[in-house]
Amino acid sequence: MPNIKVKKLSKDSTMPTRGSEEAAGWDLYSAEDVLIRPGETKKVGTGLAFEIPKGTFGAIFARSGLATKQGLAPANKVGVCDSDYRGEYIVALHNHSDEPSMVHKGDRIAQLVLMPYFAYPMIEVDELEDTERGKGGFGSTGK
């Protein structure tokens, strides 16, 4: 398994950590103090840049504790970090609560999960193969 190269963009940045040996996600830490008011979205820097292997991408997910205790979660629900991106990983956090929330430098703000992907070529066609489901969507298969 290859090593993931991580560049600290400031000496005070915190390297990602995993909560347990089997944890799928790496905790990402805030590199700054940020106040997020109710209904507001703020970009929070991690102070880190990554070099992840080709054929994989980084998915940035909410941390369950931050979402349930402070109402903070990534604004775009899941962030996608491509393997050729070399800039700082920044998490856009949205405050879903009725109270202001302070993110402190060193707080865990999200989790990064590395996943493989398939880059299949796409072609335009006039017709698609029929299936039993057809065009049924949005609950069409039941509750």
Describe each region flagged by the PLM.
Residues 1-143:
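DUTPase catalytic domain/fold
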